[in-house]
From Swiss-Prot:
<dbReference type="InterPro" id="IPR002302">
    <property type="entry name" value="Leu-tRNA-ligase"/>
</dbReference>
<protein>
    <recommendedName>
        <fullName>Leucine--tRNA ligase</fullName>
        <ecNumber>6.1.1.4</ecNumber>
    </recommendedName>
</protein>
<keyword id="KW-0648">Protein biosynthesis</keyword>
<dbReference type="InterPro" id="IPR001412">
    <property type="entry name" value="aa-tRNA-synth_I_CS"/>
</dbReference>
<keyword id="KW-0547">Nucleotide-binding</keyword>
<dbReference type="GO" id="GO:0002161">
    <property type="term" value="F:aminoacyl-tRNA deacylase activity"/>
</dbReference>
<dbReference type="Pfam" id="PF09334">
    <property type="entry name" value="tRNA-synt_1g"/>
</dbReference>
<dbReference type="InterPro" id="IPR025709">
    <property type="entry name" value="Leu_tRNA-synth_edit"/>
</dbReference>
<dbReference type="GO" id="GO:0005524">
    <property type="term" value="F:ATP binding"/>
</dbReference>
<dbReference type="InterPro" id="IPR014729">
    <property type="entry name" value="Rossmann-like_a/b/a_fold"/>
</dbReference>
<keyword id="KW-0030">Aminoacyl-tRNA synthetase</keyword>
<feature type="binding site">
    <location>
        <position position="583"/>
    </location>
    <ligand>
        <name>ATP</name>
    </ligand>
</feature>
<dbReference type="Pfam" id="PF13603">
    <property type="entry name" value="tRNA-synt_1_2"/>
</dbReference>
<dbReference type="Pfam" id="PF08264">
    <property type="entry name" value="Anticodon_1"/>
</dbReference>
<feature type="short sequence motif" description="'HIGH' region">
    <location>
        <begin position="40"/>
        <end position="50"/>
    </location>
</feature>
<keyword id="KW-0067">ATP-binding</keyword>
<dbReference type="InterPro" id="IPR015413">
    <property type="entry name" value="Methionyl/Leucyl_tRNA_Synth"/>
</dbReference>
Amino acid sequence: MYYNFVDIEKKWQKKWLEEKAFAVREDESKKKYYVLEMFPYPSGNLHMGHVRNYSIGDVVARFKRMNGFNVLHPMGWDAFGLPAENAAIKRGVHPNDWTWSNIDNMRRQLKQLGISYDWDREVATCHPDYYKWTQWMFLQLYKNGLAYKKKAYVNWCPSCATVLANEQVVNGVCERCKSVVGKKDLEQWFFKITDYAQRLLDDIEKLKGWPDKVKVMQQNWIGRSEGVEVDFKVDGMDKAVRVYTTRPDTIYGVTYVVIAPEHPVVKELIKGTEQEQVCNEFINKMMFLNEIDRTATDVEKEGVFTGRYVINPLNGDRVPLYLANYVLAEYGTGVVMAVPAHDQRDFEFAKKYNLPIKVVIQPEGQELDASRMTEAFVEVGYLVNSAEFDGVRSDEAIGKIIDYIEQKGYGKRKINYRLRDWLISRQRYWGAPIPIIYCDDCGAVPVPEEDLPVILPTDIKFSGVGESPLSTSETFISAPCPKCGKMGRRELDTMDTFVCSSWYYLRYCDPCNDKAPFDKERIRYWLPVDQYIGGVEHAILHLLYSRFLMKVLYDLGYVDYDEPFTNLLTQGMVLKDGAKMSKSLGNVVSPEEIIEKYGADTARLFILFASPPEKDLEWSDQGVEGCYRFINRVWRIVNEFADAVKEGGNIDTSTFTKADKELWYMLNNTLKRVTDDISQRFNFNTAISAVMELVNSLYYYKDKVADDSKNKALVREVIEKLIIMLAPFIPHATEELWSAIGKEGSVHEQKWPSFDPAALVKDEIEIVVQINGKVRDKIVVPSDLTKEQVEERALNSEKIKAETAGKNVVKVISVPGKLVNIVVK
């Protein structure tokens, strides 16, 4: 019987869809399992990274269903974003039309893969029924003081006269017109994620099922540090600059202070000084550099003297105040004290600008000479030139000096975070409108919840230049003030797409609710997500924002959990020729081409077999062909044994021949391995490998055992369990094979089989016999022999007796159940 994957896959996809085979409802009598892959941006076509992500999730979903769980496995679309707007500018296609056309195509491709989604729960973030509730989320944060507006620097293209997202700035120039991009200070909306910094950090401990690397990335991004803020008075002005440092033990070694060029006080400090012009030129230069270009360790340190000096409150030293590229206003206070003797960055800057270097920490038993130093000393040592703290170990001096600073009123202890508030404003059209109306009398007024959604207008001119595209809509701009009724102006910014994706996992639980974003009882049943799957590139922003929003909703009483994802799997990339697939490299493999040539089951099997899920996967055409051949082998042997399966009775192990026992052992050993590999480790590659070994054993049994000696009951057991074990990996072929052996219903509705522990205890085992570490024989012995009895059998083997004749046996080393090594001279 020919394996006609084209007809088979179409047949079962149609049947699953018509019968809503994977639709699910809350059922308190069953244990729930929520498996979720990160939803895609609808770019137009699936790529192999998508196939890998969704195939992994589908194995988990199907396996859990077969283990009796009530499985929620939904899919949707992260549908707002810049590409749709660029399509409108370049091709004259409205973002809405472009997006929905792409969604239709990608949905079709997903169905081609046979992923077991509950399509009744499909969501798209660009649909008003969805972004109504994104706007509702904004209002909850706004009402509770967690959404606010302030001025912030944004990327600005002077040629396009528009704000650019970071993604639109490539090597410092606008990707559209290639003009040099600068910075502009504009009013922007923020979410106050910094209020949750410590909780987000502390609760990383709860994330037992997350990869360590992701947890470390989040810890570093939040970036908690303990230090002290100290005020350095500006000489000749009634003003001070506030320094934040985690190294107060070095404060007596400050020889200059650095302030960020964009710090709000800089303009006042330089005004009227001889350095004003050169400082302004430097400030303008810094505006055209991004954070990475300024702060990377390999970037040359640059700065200019402000013409001002500041006073170190601890020793009265008058030190110069510099602007420098490596200090950012967003971090700490935007001002740092420079101790070149004990900080490498400061050391390099001091050498470049011929600034003093003052040693205040000496290594034990040595004496540093500042004039001869070639690098900063950053290890633990003992304080010198530090007044009353001389002789104190530097790590012990930190706390003592902070106490002294507080006692003297020079400053105070401070915990700082690298994490900044979440800037959500986008001067874009294709995003969720921010539900705020500006009234000349009432100020910024939130749109009432009953008036949501604020719908995106359609009368938009997409030029790619000027202000937000929403400003071109005459129907959108004007709106009555919800407080006083006078005509006001709508907010023209839209929300960052990360806002939409920070709560979508909640909407899946209740996607058709038009009264609320979700029903609390349904959320209580399904949440948290048991298994989340996606790329490590989302380790920080998306996952951190989702955790933040969940904690806000928890604090407001809308949910009962404050962490959204119990377990996280970050799958590796799909590579070809050692590089990530990309059009520019010409190494892209189209999923549709593979499906057309080999079928979806082959594509899935290869992507799951070629590598553990968390590792990168190297594409191999030969590997794909090998997986196709394996499915054909399974297809042939199941169909050859189909009649025997239908005739097979109940298993009676007491009648087993030696060949029967070997096949029975292989079946149960495979069941154990596959179950453990899927449920405990997600090692799908080794699970598939185990099934391949079972298929080899089945072929051996078919070829070596005469037809009239074959145990039909055993064959039936092996074939049935083989099909069930393969079902999560190759769902279409196994449905067809299940039907071919005369079974009713779907294979995916079958109970996952358990193994028989007794079957894993062999009556006989094979022992490798070595002489001086080299294999010389293999013997079969009863499994219940003692160590001494096995060694005796090994020494009495005819081959071993011949090899050791005339030699002195020095000792015998045994590894129970595996080998005997005889050492001779």
